[in-house]
Structures are given as C-alpha cells and as structure tokens.
Amino acid sequence: MLVENSEPEASTPTQPEAAPPSSPRPSAPARPDKVCGWEPFSLVVDELWPLLKRHYHELGAYEAAPLDPDWDRYFEYERCGILRIWTMRSEGVLIGYVVCQVVHGLHSRNTKYCFGDLFWLAPEWRDGLSGMRMLRGVLKALKDMGVHIVRWETNDTFEPDATGRSRVAALLSRLGFKPIGTVLQKVLTHE
C-alpha cells in the first residue's frame, strides 16, 4: 500500500522464511505515470529483494561484503520506526527506492538525522528527471517529519563524471548537499 508523503503505517511485520521471490509483482493498484511515497518495509520486501540484487550487481564493488541482507535487523528497524523506504512505482510496479534510517543524534539528542543507505532507480528509468523527482520527494517528506540533517555516502567508483564524482553525488550536489569530510575504508582480511 503506497501512502504518499506520510509515515509508514504500524504493522505487524512477518519475516520471510527464505529470500523473497525473484520476480517483482505489483503490491499496489496500477497508477498512471510514476508515483512516489513511503511504504512499510514489511509490505515491499518481496518486491525489493530482486531490485536489491540488481542494484548490488550493478555496483560490483563489494567483493569483501557479499550481498546477504540481515532481514532480522531490517524488520527490527522497521518496528523501532528507524527504517524508512521511499518507493517509486510505474503502473504499480516498483522501479526504484530510497532506503534510509531516521534517528536522533547521540551527540545532539534534539537533532533528528537521516542517514541515506540506498538509492536506486532501474536503469531503464534513469533518463529525464525521475531520480531528481524521487530525491526531492524524500527531502520534502523528511523535512515534514522534522528531520534536521540528511547525510549520504556515495560510491564514486560507480558511473563517475569528469570530476570523479558519481552520478548520485552530482545529483545530491544539485539538491544542495555539501561535502563534509572524506570516507576512508580498509578491508581487514580474516584468513
């Protein structure tokens, strides 16, 4: 059930016994054009799984961390009100998503943060302004929820532009995001 510009409805999530099905199926009535809004994780997990696999394989930069979702934690974060899923649909079919975590700061308890985790739009929908529309909708909805600061880490090895930034980083910059530091990573091998 797609609920535009509102928080997810309380639900009693059930964890899938195995990985969700491998093919998407609409869970919302067919709608004209593209529709965006918050959806509860527990209601979109079956559709989300095949898109997560496409997203992961498209990035191809995570040999040290194979795709193996911690479904228990996803469901727990949903129950706690931390996990937010913003979806984009065309005629009821899931074509993109933003996954984020909304929490109060540990160093500033009155400051509400959103940490962007995943942003993906099916390649066949990337022409035009669909990605920009998705992110603008997310930012407006987060502001309406009282979020003060949105942070996003991007993978600059994915579709870099002439400056070395990813397409996502360039898109976020156009929406007013500013660099605040550098993310450094070291993979520790456990032989």
Locations of the language-model features?
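Glycine-rich phosphate/pyrophosphate-binding loop shared by adenosine-nucleotide-utilizing enzymes
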Residues: 92-97, 114
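A conserved beta-turn-beta hairpin within the catalytic core of GNAT-like acetyltransferases
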Residues: 104-116, 179-180
